Amino acid sequence: FVFSNTIIRRSILEKTGLFDEKLISYGGEDTELAIRINRVFPKNLRKCMDAVSIHYSDKTLNQYRKNMFEYGLNNFNHIIEKHPDYKKKLGANLIYSFKGYLIFNSISRNLCLFLLNLIRHPLLVKFLVVSSFVQGVRNSKNS
């Protein structure tokens, strides 16, 4: 779910509850809440493709990657344990698969960082962000 810039009626939150306070650091609280809302109101989440949202942030790429690492490290497994039927939809199956290790590893990360210095392409940025999240999830299993 992409939950940014969502308008929710108070009555919906009264039925589903607020953010899960067991999520202890950055990330995932909106996804977890969206799952609960979708369970109670499966046909009521809609998106408007014409809506425009501009998000200004002064975070650097490294700060954002650190946030995504923390999300993977601290919160993602709690969400999967709470909602195991969303494991595949949230991409958890890929993290420990052969394909996941082939895609998200230190070689591909370093190559991506090198290429990012040459060309500022948004796919390189997205890869690094997702890779940081995957690293966090993998490290959470090791701790």
Where are these regions (language model features)?
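An anion-binding catalytic pocket shared by soluble metabolic enzymes
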Residues: 1-3
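A short, conserved alpha-helix in the catalytic core of glycosyltransferases
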Residues: 5-8, 12-17, 23-51
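Glycine-centered small-residue hotspots that permit tight backbone geometry or close packing
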Residues: 17-18, 27-28, 74, 136-143
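Amphipathic alpha-helical segments in well-structured domains
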Residues: 30, 34, 68-73
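Non-heme di-metal
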Residues: 43, 71, 76-79
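Active-site donor/metal-binding and catalytic loop motifs
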Residues: 47-67, 78-79
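Non-catalytic, C-terminal membrane-associated alpha-helical segments of glycosyltransferases
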Residues: 70-71, 88-143
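Domain-length accessory/inserted modules outside core catalytic folds
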Residues: 76, 80, 84-94
